[in-house]
Regions:
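A short, Trp-centered hydrophobic/proline-enriched beta-strand micro-motif
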Residues: 10-24, 65-67
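General beta-strand recognition
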Residues: 19, 44-46, 77, 123
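A short mixed-secondary-structure module that forms the rim of ligand-binding clefts
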Residues: 37-71
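Charged, gly/pro-rich active-site loop segments
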Residues: 77-138
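Hydrophobic/aromatic beta-strand elements that line small-molecule binding cavities or substrate pockets
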Residues: 34-37, 82-83
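Low-complexity intrinsically disordered segments
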Residues: 4-5
Length: 138
């Protein structure tokens, strides 16, 4: 029988879009839908955005974040931290061809950056099972 964490990881693999919330300069949550470009398990998610975006400004000021995803009435809500990644090697590793529409200079585009979300706490509602738990480092 699959654990709730395994179910959540499988669900995340099927979700193309997640909601990522930063904390604004005024202290309010600012959730935005974003394309999930990669993930590990249920709790580490990679996303991309422009280095000049408001969310990057927020995360550089305060890395605390929330991330949620859902499918067919099931959902996972995570809290954790976001790291803004700008090193060329990692940017190249995660580059996807459709990014060229937003970053015309490819993975070397100075505005292209990655966001790495790592959860510290999770709330699961999957198959009518409701669980809150700390996320252990893997």
């Amino acid at each position: 029988m699959e654990s709730i964490e395994e179910k959540a990881a499988s669900m995340l693999q099927r979700c193309e879009t997640v909601n990522l919330a930063s904390v604004s300069m005024e202290g309010y949550p600012r959730p935005v839908p974003m394309a999930r470009i990669s993930s590990k398990g249920f709790s580490t998610v990679w996303l991309t955005t422009g280095k000049d975006s408001l969310k990057v400004k927020h995360f550089l000021e305060n890395p605390k974040a929330g991330l949620s995803y859902f499918e067919n009435g099931n959902c996972v809500v995570l809290t954790g931290n976001v790291e803004v990644i700008t090193d060329l090697e990692t940017k190249k590793q995660f580059w996807i061809d459709w990014f060229i529409e937003y970053f015309p200079n490819g993975f070397e585009d100075t505005n292209y950056c990655l966001l790495k979300f790592k959860a510290t706490y999770a709330t699961f509602w999957i198959d009518k099972e409701f669980i809150h738990k700390e996320v252990k480092e893997v």
